[in-house]
Curated annotation (Swiss-Prot):
Major place of residence: other
Pfam family name, one: TPR_12
Name of the protein described by the UniProt record: Tetratricopeptide repeat protein 23
Keyword Repeat recorded: yes
Function: Participates positively in the ciliary Hedgehog (Hh) signaling.
Keywords: Cell projection, Repeat, TPR repeat
GO terms for cellular component: cilium
GO biological process: positive regulation of smoothened signaling pathway
Assembly, per entry: Associated with the EvC complex composed of EFCAB7, IQCE, EVC2 and EVC.
Segments of this protein annotated with the region Disordered: 410-446
Lineage: Eukaryota, Metazoa, Chordata, Craniata, Vertebrata
Ranges for the TPR repeats: 45-78, 137-170, 186-219, 310-347, 356-389
Length: 446
């Protein structure tokens, strides 16, 4: 009897404990649900704007775009169809579309809608509203960027000029402080530079890149990550103008900034690779050591991160081999090409442009050594893959076929210990197009 009472009391206590622990949880969930359902639209708008900024800062642009669409709908509910806040929401949405490839037209449409709203809504008291002026600057800048992406350079330049003039007027009237104006100027100057560079006018683009960098360094700091894309674009313009020392130095500066930001191995590799490529592009022997150093850094980072059997590693390794050929280190380049063949088959497929190109280069190397049998065998494999990929009338296929025709008519000559510069010049042109998977696995020993 006593045992039965104890059991009953124990069960009753369990029920009380469960009720105490579960009921508040249910109440909390209900409260959160009710709060979400009955949350004021302006509070929902604020939270959605914060989410959009968070997604954009972490480069999750599709999620950010979803929130920006939500923001525009909530802004219309909160402020109506004619308020400048709705124009601002359209501008922000246009910026979101610009982050996604192929969406420039949508960005332009939203920027134009914002312009339409501002044109019809700006009247007292809005005419004295600093926020409206800021929105107008962002509108003209964003519309300029959208037109730039659509390669409408003249219209883009007109809108960027409007943004520049308006921001200067705001500074003179005391509506913005100088630091804020410099941040705006940095973005506008960069867009102007891109307008000129898009038209291959590197000479006109150069001073705008330099001003954009100067304003960014002042407003954000010389070691800021915001300087990196500007330094890289500036380096490209300098390279196009033949200012190779300046180009290499700017890319090295960008690389050092990247390394300070604790990048991933792949990011560090990509940054080092850009320096190496700039050093090669100069065509000057004094830059060979720089190219060697940064190629090694790039490949070491990728090897540590993912191993040697990745598309990225093999692509950079091929660039390194071409550098070795340019500097007369043909035997080392050929050895690396030969060793990489099996990995390329595994990564790109048997019948891929990468495998075809490697067979072609190995065939050229054999030909330079006087090994006509080996050259014919490798070039034949290259021709088979090229015919499958590009067809028999493609210029790459025809070039390989022509080489084989000449080779088949030539008498066998003794193998030479060193490559012939003439042969290398005749047969060393080529690139690495996109990959196509295949089936049969060629032997790397061939």
């Amino acid at each position: 009897m006593q045992e039965s009472q104890e059991t009953h009391i124990s069960n009753h206590l369990d029920e009380i404990v469960a009720a105490v622990s579960i009921t508040p949880r249910k109440k909390l969930l209900n409260q959160l649900l009710q709060r979400a359902l009955f949350q004021p639209p302006r509070e929902k708008l604020r939270l959605s704007e914060e989410k959009a900024k968070s997604y954009a800062s972490s480069h999750e642009y599709k999620k950010a775009l979803h929130e920006l669409v939500h923001c525009m709908a909530l802004t219309r509910i909160c402020y109506g169809d004619s308020h400048w806040k709705l124009a601002e929401a359209h501008v922000n949405l246009a910026k979101g579309y610009l982050q996604l490839k192929g969406m420039s037209l949508r960005a332009k449409q939203h920027a134009e809608k914002a312009k339409e709203i501002l044109t019809s809504s700006v009247a007292p008291p809005y005419s004295d509203n600093t926020d409206v002026f800021k929105c107008s600057v962002e509108l003209f800048h964003t519309l300029g960027q959208a037109l730039l992406s659509l390669q409408k350079f003249k219209e883009a330049s007109k809108n960027l000029t409007k943004a520049e003039i308006l921001s200067k007027e705001m500074l003179q009237c005391g509506k913005i402080i100088k630091e804020e104006w410099m941040e705006i100027q940095a973005r506008i100057k960069l867009s102007f530079a891109q307008v000129y560079q898009g038209q291959k006018k590197s000479k006109e683009a150069l001073p705008h890149y330099q001003e954009a960098l100067e304003y960014t360094e002042i407003s954000r700091g010389e070691k800021s990550l915001e300087c990196v894309p500007i330094l890289r674009e500036l380096a490209a313009a300098e390279q196009a103008l033949g200012f190779h020392d300046a180009s290499i130095n700017n890319l090295i500066q960008a690389h050092l900034i990247v390394l300070r930001g604790s990048p991933s191995r792949e990011e560090a590799a990509t940054s080092a690779h850009s320096v190496a490529c700039a050093a090669i592009a100069s065509g000057r022997p004094e830059h060979h050591d720089v190219a060697e150093q940064y190629f090694q850094d790039s490949m070491a980072n990728l090897k540590d991160a993912e191993g040697k059997e990745t598309a990225k590693f093999l692509s950079i390794q091929d660039d390194y081999c071409h550098f070795l050929q340019v500097t007369g280190q043909d035997e080392k380049a050929t050895s690396i090409f030969r060793e990489s063949l099996e990995a390329k088959v595994a990564v790109f497929g048997d019948f891929s442009p990468e495998v075809a190109e490697t067979y072609r280069l190995l065939g050229v190397a054999d030909l330079a050594q006087g090994n006509q049998t080996g050259a014919h065998k490798k070039l034949k494999k290259c021709l088979q893959i090229q015919t499958l990929l590009y067809g028999p009338q493609d210029k790459r296929t025809l070039a390989t076929q022509q080489t084989m025709d000449i080779l088949s008519k030539a008498p066998e000559v003794p193998a030479r210990p060193r490559p012939s510069p003439g042969a290398k010049a005749a047969f060393c042109a080529g690139g690495r197009p996109y990959s196509v998977p295949g089936r049969t696995r060629p032997s790397a020993a061939d």
